[in-house]
């Protein structure tokens, strides 16, 4: 889903729990920590870290040292495919399925309502407009075991921060806690925030817009000058 404001980033933090008493310290240390960024509208050349065999002209425009450091200390994948809008790409990352398999082929928001504009000359195909669930029998969803759930079963603590956009309002998939995450910070059904500003309570109410965009769970920062990025952090 495209917006005329800055990049929307959600971060998945997956750390191996040190509370697994049945495992030795050596076994625990073999489990790597995982940080996965879901970034909207970011091209493969929109950073200083090259994802090609050589640095491109556009790579030289940007300065993203943290991405370079993460790639140097971790693992970089250079062959991938992303969909034109966010929900399909996010669900593919969560499930390992491509769009033809999970059939979430557009961004999701309202239950049983497609965001596609109505046209008299075209009948849109049936698709999973309610997003994804993990076991619940919800119409027009893809039911699948998620990556965070599998990691949690392997002893990881899973944290989601920022934009979620995995399932429509009123379905279990709107809440990352129902998709294998232990902690959810600000993630909900909408594909963007009502506002980035704490003085507006991260809500669209100040411009008389739909409250469906309000960011949940950040009430302690309401009425302050805390920018959304800082509140999530």
Q: What is the predicted function of each stretch?
A:
Residues 27-75, 164:
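Active-site-proximal N-terminal segment of extracellular/periplasmic enzymes that hydrolyze or transfer
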Residues 55-90, 96-101, 157-159, 179-188:
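Short, structured active-site-proximal loop/turn typified by the sulfatase FGly-forming signature C/S-X-P-X-R
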């Amino acid at each position: 889903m495209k917006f005329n404001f800055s990049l929307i980033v959600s971060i998945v933090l997956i750390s191996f729990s040190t509370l697994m008493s049945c495992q030795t310290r050596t076994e625990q240390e073999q489990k790597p920590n995982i940080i996965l960024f879901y970034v909207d509208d970011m091209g493969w050349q929109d950073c200083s870290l090259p994802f090609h065999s050589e640095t491109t002209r556009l790579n030289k425009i940007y300065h993203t040292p943290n991405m370079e450091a993460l790639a140097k200390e971790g693992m970089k994948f250079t062959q991938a495919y992303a969909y034109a809008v966010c929900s399909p790409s996010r669900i593919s990352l969560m499930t390992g399925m491509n769009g033809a398999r999970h059939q979430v082929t557009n961004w999701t928001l309202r239950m049983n309502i497609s965001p596609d504009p109505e046209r008299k000359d075209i009948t849109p195909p049936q698709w999973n407009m309610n997003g994804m669930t993990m076991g619940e029998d919800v119409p027009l969803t893809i039911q699948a075991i998620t990556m965070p759930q599998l990691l949690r079963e392997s002893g990881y603590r899973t944290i989601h921060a920022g934009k979620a956009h995995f399932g429509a309002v009123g379905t279990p998939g709107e809440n990352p806690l129902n998709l294998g995450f232990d902690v959810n910070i600000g993630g909900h059904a909408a594909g963007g925030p009502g506002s980035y500003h704490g003085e507006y309570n991260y809500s669209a109410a100040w411009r008389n817009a739909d409250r469906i965009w309000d960011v949940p769970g950040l009430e302690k920062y309401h009425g302050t000058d805390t920018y959304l990025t800082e509140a999530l952090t």
